[in-house]
Regions:
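Forkhead-associated
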Residues: 41-118
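Intrinsically disordered, low-complexity acidic Ser/Thr-rich regulatory segments
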Residues: 1-65
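Solvent-exposed strand-loop boundary residues in beta-sheet-rich modules
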Residues: 37-39, 80, 125
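Short, Lys/Arg- and Gly-enriched loop/turn segments at beta-strand edges
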Residues: 119-125
Length: 125
């Protein structure tokens, strides 16, 4: 049998690998819509798909039970680093920062309203 390892001499180096000292990789925060008002609030929805449909229908990616929301109310699309929202010809439309719109780019802190449901957009970091 061999002699037991003597660990008192310090650590054994098996191989060396340079470490990056300029930046430490951190996981990215997800892009999300935080629901701040309406049925089910407060809660948050992570935007992971290239297209996320919001609506009352169970076929919507994010289904919200509210009389002010159409079956397929709006879609949030990702194009590279940008997100946009487009109304899908809903009965009540969409409002970005209190202004009715058909389509718009989403920015950090924007409020998006669909019927009686209000979201705040948060960019990943």
């Amino acid at each position: 049998m061999g002699k037991p390892d003597d660990l008192s001499d310090g650590p054994t180096t098996v191989g060396e690998m340079p470490l990056a000292t300029s930046a430490i990789a951190r996981p990215k925060k997800p892009f999300l819509l935080e629901q701040v008002a309406g049925p089910g609030a407060p809660r948050a929805f992570t935007l992971e798909l290239d297209e996320t449909v919001f609506g009352r229908s169970l076929q919507a990616n994010i289904s919200i039970e509210s009389g002010g929301i159409s079956r397929k109310h709006a879609v949030v699309r990702r194009a590279g680093p940008e997100f946009s929202v487009t109304d899908l010809n809903s009965a009540n439309g969409i409002y970005l920062n209190g202004v009715k719109t058909h389509s718009a780019i989403l920015r950090e802190g924007d409020t998006l309203q669909m019927g009686d449901v209000v979201f705040v957009f948060h960019e990943g970091a």
